[in-house]
Amino acid sequence: VVQVNLLVGRQIAIYFEGANAWLYYADRLYQLPLGVVGVAIGIVLLPDLSRRLRVGDEAGGQEAFNRAAELSLLLTIPCTVALVVIPSALVSVLFERGAFVASDTQATALATAIYGLGLPAFVLQKLYQPVFFAREDTRSPFNFALVALVVNAVVAIGLSRYIGFTAAAYGATCAGWAMLVCLWWGARRFGAAASWDAQLRKRSLRILLASLVMGAVVWITARALEPVLQMAGLRLLGLAVILGVAGLSYALAGRLLGAFSLAQLRQMIRRAD
C-alpha cells in the first residue's frame, strides 16, 4: 500500500516539469523528523506499550500509550511548525546550489510545508498500530491503509488539474490523517487502552501553544537573518542560529506553559531501560 501511495504521487509529478525533484527533496526533509521521532518512541516507549497490552494490563497499557503519545507530540508539533513557518530557509540552505535555483527552492518549500502538516498524523499512526498488533489484529490496519490509499488517489488526481504538482503532497497529507482517524476509530473497541487521558489532553494543548510561540520567534529570526542566508559562506551558520533559537524558545515556552515535565521524561527513559 505504501508503494502504491508513492506511485500515485510520482504519476502526478510526471505531468509537471521539475515536480519529481521538488517532491523528492520535500519528502526527504519531512522524513527526517519522522524518522527521528519514530526511532525515539520505538526505542523508548513502544516496547513497554506492546508488552503491557499483550499481558492484558489495560491500566498500564493506557498509561504507556498516553505517555508515548505525549512524547510524540512534544517532539513532532514543533517540527511541524518549523516545516510550515521556515521551509524556504531550510530548502535554500540545504539544496539551493548548482542547477537547483531559487524557483526550485520556492516549489520545494511549498511541498515541504504541505508534507509537514501531515507529520503528526504519520507519527501517531506508529502509536495506534501496536494496539491492534498486540491483539493479533493485522487486518484492520491493512483495511485502513486501503482507505488512505483511496483518499490519496482521489485528492491527488482530483486536485492536480487545479493546483498542479502540490496535489500529490496534499494527497499524501490527507491520506495520513485519514489513516489516523481510521486507527483512532477502530481502536475504540479496545476500551481504555488507546484513549487519551486528562494529562495528555491538557499537555497536547500546551505543546501546541509552546510550538506556536516558537514559530513566531523563528519566523522573526529567519526574517532578520534573511541576508545571511543568501551568503554562501554563512548560510549554514545562519540556519544553525535559527534552529538554535527554535530549540531554546520552544524549551522556554514549554517550561513556562507546563507542556512537559523533565522528571517524567527521565522516568520514561528509565522505564525503557
Region annotations inferred by a language model:
Residues 1-273:
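Membrane-embedded alpha-helical bundles of multi-pass transporters/translocases
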